């Protein structure tokens, strides 16, 4: 099997390399692609040194079986035909094709069969916040249909890229030294602050990030589920957290939900609050599962249930989910 990584030098591209190294996939050849800025860089994979090739409109993708792409929406749109024209399946991490009717949007724990319905040979990876939420929601959906979801996200700096992480670190150092903090990657200082603003605002006063959670959840789950989200950037380096409230068609006991989460693929139950056992980014960073805890009956709605989930948005929220999509196609 011949695999390409497009955007190999970025945070997700580097995670692709690590995950392919870890998992027992039959990779006969791995080809790395990048922009002019990253072309020529060298990385090790399974004992071999690989050089990043410049992504161009040519026949470099001839013979490629799968292309894992994380280079931004504009690059994905521009190069989709180049990547797929010789038969490669493009698994795209950007927002470029997610809501296209003829492009499946896949989370393997939820809708793996959709991956085989890709007439354009493009499969979209959902947004990171959507991925971890639907992995958890699917466990509840198996018990009773979910009518509504309210979710507030606590999204780490790394969701905005490596430069955003560096800025958060720099802000802490600058403030500690009594200096004015550098503010470039976020609308405001993130250190010692939270910012209820991720992506641009839309006409309905929700941000694009929040509307992604609405539209993507419905497409992935093939459901009329209604999702109202508030997405917040918090001064955490890595791993996103979500406070989730669901209304189901029938009342669910917390014990039922715990059992469902414990049995759900991709979920690790951490729900012993009396013993201070609950998910946190501190423990989830660098890990694969979606961690779920703080499961409780809602006090304001008979059919309501609340829980808290945490996951590494670079692994399960991006690179791992894409590799799992590839694995479902083998």
Set out the residue ranges of the language-model regions.
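Charged docking surfaces used in two-component/phosphorelay signaling
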Residues: 67, 157-330
């Amino acid at each position: 099997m011949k695999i390409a990584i497009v955007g190999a030098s970025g945070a997700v591209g580097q995670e692709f390399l690590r995950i392919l190294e870890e998992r027992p996939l039959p990779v006969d050849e791995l080809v790395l692609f990048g922009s002019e800025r990253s072309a020529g860089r060298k990385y090790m994979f399974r004992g071999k040194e690989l050089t990043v090739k410049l992504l161009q409109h040519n026949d470099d993708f001839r013979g490629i079986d799968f292309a894992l792409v994380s280079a931004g929406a504009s690059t994905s749109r521009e190069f989709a035909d180049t990547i797929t024209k010789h038969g490669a399946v493009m698994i795209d991490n950007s927002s470029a094709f997610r809501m296209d009717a003829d492009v499946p949007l896949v989370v393997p724990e939820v809708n793996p069969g959709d991956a085989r319905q890709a007439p354009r040979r493009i499969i979209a990876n959902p947004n990171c916040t959507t991925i971890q939420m639907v992995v958890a929601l699917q466990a509840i959906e198996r018990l009773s249909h979910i009518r509504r979801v309210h979710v507030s996200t606590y999204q780490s700096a790394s969701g905005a890229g490596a430069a955003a992480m560096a800025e958060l670190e720099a802000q802490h150092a600058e403030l500690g030294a009594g200096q004015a903090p550098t503010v470039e990657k976020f609308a405001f200082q993130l250190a010692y602050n939270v910012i209820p603003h991720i992506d641009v605002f839309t006409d309905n006063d929700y941000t694009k990030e929040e509307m992604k959670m609405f539209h993507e959840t419905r497409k992935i789950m093939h459901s009329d589920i209604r999702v109202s989200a508030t997405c917040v950037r918090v001064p955490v380096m890595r791993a996103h957290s979500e406070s989730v409230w669901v209304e189901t068609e029938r009342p669910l006991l917390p014990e039922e939900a715990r059992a469902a989460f414990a049995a759900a693929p991709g979920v690790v139950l951490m729900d012993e609050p009396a013993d201070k056992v609950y998910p946190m980014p501190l423990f989830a960073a660098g890990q694969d599962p979606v961690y779920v805890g703080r499961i409780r009956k809602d006090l304001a709605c008979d059919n309501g249930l609340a829980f808290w989930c945490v996951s590494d948005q670079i692994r399960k929220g991006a690179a791992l989910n894409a590799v799992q999509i590839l694995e479902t196609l083998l």
